[in-house]
Structure formats: C-alpha cells, structure tokens
Amino acid sequence: MSSSSLSPTAGRTSGSDGDSAADTHRREKRRLSNRESARRSRLRKQQHLDELVQEVARLQADNARVAARARDIASQYTRVEQENTVLRARAAELGDRLRSVNEVLRLVEEFSGVAMDIQEEMPADDPLLRPWQLPYPAAAMPMGAPHMLHY
C-alpha cells in the first residue's frame, strides 16, 4: 500500500476546491467540537475532584468527632471501673460488719434468751448485685413465630 492510498483525498481530483473547503470546514468543526468536549471533560474532572476534597474534609471531621467520643467513653469507662472497685470494697467491708453484728446478736440472743431478728447476709448470687446481667438466660425468639414481626 502506498501512502497516497491511505490519504483521505486519495482518488479525488486536485481540481475540486469545493470538496477541499468542505473537508477543511468539517475538520475545523470537529477540532472545535473536540476542544469543547475536552473543556467539558476537564470541568467534570475538576468538579469531581472538588467533591472528593469536600468528602475528605467531611470524613476527617467525622473521624475526629468519633475519636473524641471514643476518648470520652474510655475515660468514663475508667471512671466507672474505679467507682465500681470502691463500691465493691465498701460492699465487702459492710458484709464483714454485718457478720460481726450478727455474731454479737447471736451471743446476746443465746445469753439473754430474747429472740433477736438477725438479718442474714444476702446471697452472693443475688441478681441485685449484678444489675447488668439478666437473672435468667435470654431465650431466642422461636423460629415458628415469623407472624409476630409485622413492620
């Protein structure tokens, strides 16, 4: 194949200036269309980049809020754990005092013959001592009850 056979004007006569002007006009029109298309494409890319930058800023702000909240919760957890440790020690101390008082009351009851109302210790497995635990095992929803879930 020769290079002249690949030319878009191959097979045309060189005397047809009307076709050449039309080809030039089409090429110029296509060039302008391509420029406009490229400009719109750059504009879309810039808008997308701006949106991504805004999203990054929003996500960083959200991340900072979540991190601050996590720090607050961690400090509250530490404070509550310390308070629980103090309360457990106090409960153990009060339990010891109750046992001592009960022993004294039993001795008084034994030697005086007067019946005493002796408060016995609360059992160690008392659910009131475990407020965050259920006093009974959590039962799963029966599989045969899907009719109960109406939205």
UniProtKB/Swiss-Prot annotation:
Residues 1-47 are annotated as: Disordered. Pfam families: bZIP_1. Residues 24-87 form the bZIP domain. GO terms for molecular function: DNA-binding transcription factor activity; protein heterodimerization activity; transcription cis-regulatory region binding. It is found in: Nucleus. GO terms for cellular component: nucleus. Residues 1-17 have a biased composition (Polar residues). Gene3D superfamilies: 1.20.5.170. May contribute to developmentally specific patterns of gene expression. Binds specifically to ocs elements which are transcriptional enhancer found in the promoters of several plant genes. OCSBF-1 is able to bind to a site within each half of the ocs element as well as to animal AP-1 and CREB sites. Belongs to the bZIP family. This is Ocs element-binding factor 1. The lineage of its organism: Eukaryota, Viridiplantae, Streptophyta, Embryophyta, Tracheophyta.
